[in-house]
Amino acid sequence: MALGSALGIAAGACASDAIVSVPPDIQHRTVQVSVGQEIHITLGNVGPAEYESPPQISSPAISFLGVDVVPPFTPAGPTQQFRFKAVQRGVAAIHFRRLLGDSLVYTVDDTVVVR
């Protein structure tokens, strides 16, 4: 967690359909959600490297739904938004690997706590 400060992002318990959005400004986050909620994790890129899809997920507490390139569209590199669904109680570590070809450039590790 060299760059990371832990950030607890909590979602309202009554809003199980609400989307929990995690912005790209903080890396290595901890997110708390309820079963049924969707989680959007946004990661920015500088240069031609991109985050690998799907990312590595440590447990079945969440499922990977997909990834999209989202605004802002900059010449520096794409902004990627990864979408997940909280499917059962538990804790899942998500390991994002930023690759340039076969070379590892950077990693981000986020944790999702599903209540």
What are these regions (language model features)?
Residues 95-107:
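Short, exposed beta-strand-loop hairpins at the edges of beta-sheets
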Residues 48-72:
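Short, solvent-exposed loop/linker segments at beta-strand-coil boundaries, enriched for Pro/Gly
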Residues 107-113:
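C-terminal edge beta-strand
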Residues 40-46:
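Short edge beta-strand/loop segments characteristic of extracellular beta-sandwich folds
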Residues 15-39:
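N-terminal edge beta-strand
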Residues 84-94:
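Glycine-centered tight-turn and secondary-structure capping sites
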Residues 11-13:
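C-terminal motif of bacterial Sec signal peptides marking the signal peptidase cleavage site
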Residues 29, 80-82:
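Short strand-edge motifs at loop-to-beta-strand transitions and within beta-strands
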